[in-house]
């Protein structure tokens, strides 16, 4: 960041000087005007947030052995669904894009700012990586690949609907597959509602009725969205943000039955620092059993940057931060 700025008059003088002398040699430019590269790795086993100081909205992450893969919303950008890889959850590198073009192609043949890929989830199941995302105008799509850095399949429309967003699959111990998702009030005229529906075992089609499992309109946890679906110690968990992007907090809801009833509590508060959020993200466990939570913070013109938080469990409830 520049430590001082030029007034308009000084800027005119500087520009005239450049015209007269033919430009200022690069060597004459001082170091104080060069931007530093952001590095979250402090080099001593510690890190600082954000771990990704760039616009990766609604991140989700999965672990396979010692490899971590992250994807995020790409909206109407092409290629879409960036795939980032890391060995330590701190140092990330873009290795691929899972979506070559948006579908339906005729609709996205023209600019559709803010539409497209909303809040994807990434999972590993039976030797394949799956990414699900919601298009608020068309429904839930899925792509899959054996190698995240390789070729991804063509998108499959898992559930056609207007207003469904933030989908996340869960393969249960008995082989059944479920989909959790939220609603966009701008399309469906409802929000703060989380639903679960059964899919076929392949995860390619919703085959059962949708059931409301959490209604944030009935309590103080409004604007419930972005559910991530997990199972641990016999409990089904929905981890999701509430309260809004800039003023919200993290929630967890759990039940012994996939369709509920779910009991819910806050697991990470807003806090009283200038840092807003925490907003949408996901839980990941390392090969050594450590638990971490990745989420985004809305940083205005810098975009939605990615934070990494330690996570523990107490009485079968997650504790984030």
Language-model segments: which ranges?
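Bacterial N-terminal signal peptides that target proteins for export
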Residues: 2-14
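Extreme N-termini of proteins with methionine-enriched Sec-type signal peptides or N-terminal signal-anchor
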Residues: 1-2, 28
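Bacterial N-terminal signal peptides
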Residues: 12-23
């Amino acid at each position: 960041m520049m430590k001082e700025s030029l007034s308009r008059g000084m800027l005119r003088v500087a520009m005239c000087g450049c015209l007269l002398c033919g430009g200022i040699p690069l060597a004459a430019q001082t170091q104080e005007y060069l931007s530093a590269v952001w590095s979250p790795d402090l080099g001593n086993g510690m890190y600082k947030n954000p771990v990704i100081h760039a616009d990766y909205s609604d991140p989700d992450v999965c672990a396979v052995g010692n490899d971590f893969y992250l994807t995020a919303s790409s909206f109407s950008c092409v290629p879409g669904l960036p795939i980032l890889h890391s060995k330590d959850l701190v140092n990330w590198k873009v290795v691929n894009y899972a979506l070559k073009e948006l579908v339906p192609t005729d609709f996205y043949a023209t600019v559709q700012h803010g539409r497209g890929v909303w809040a994807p989830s990434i999972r590993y199941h039976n030797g394949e990586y799956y990414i699900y995302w919601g298009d608020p105008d068309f429904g839930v799509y899925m792509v899959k690949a054996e190698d995240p850095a390789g070729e991804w399949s063509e998108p499959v429309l898992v559930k056609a609907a207007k207003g469904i967003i933030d989908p996340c699959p869960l393969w249960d111990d008995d082989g059944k597959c479920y989909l959790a998702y939220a609603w966009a009030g701008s399309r469906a005229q409802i929000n703060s509602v989380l639903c679960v529906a059964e899919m076929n075992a392949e995860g390619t089609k919703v085959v059962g009725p949708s059931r409301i499992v959490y209604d944030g309109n009935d309590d103080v946890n409004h604007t419930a969205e972005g559910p991530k679906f997990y199972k641990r110690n016999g409990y089904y968990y929905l981890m999701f943000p509430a309260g809004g992007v800039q003023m919200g907090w993290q929630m967890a809801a759990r039940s012994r039955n996939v369709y509920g009833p779910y009991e819910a509590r806050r697991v990470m508060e807003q806090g009283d620092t200038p840092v807003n959020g925490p907003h949408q993200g996901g839980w990941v466990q390392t090969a050594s059993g450590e638990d971490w939570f990745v989420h985004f913070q809305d940083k205005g013109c810098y975009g939605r940057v990615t934070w990494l938080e330690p996570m523990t469990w107490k009485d079968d409830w997650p504790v984030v931060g």
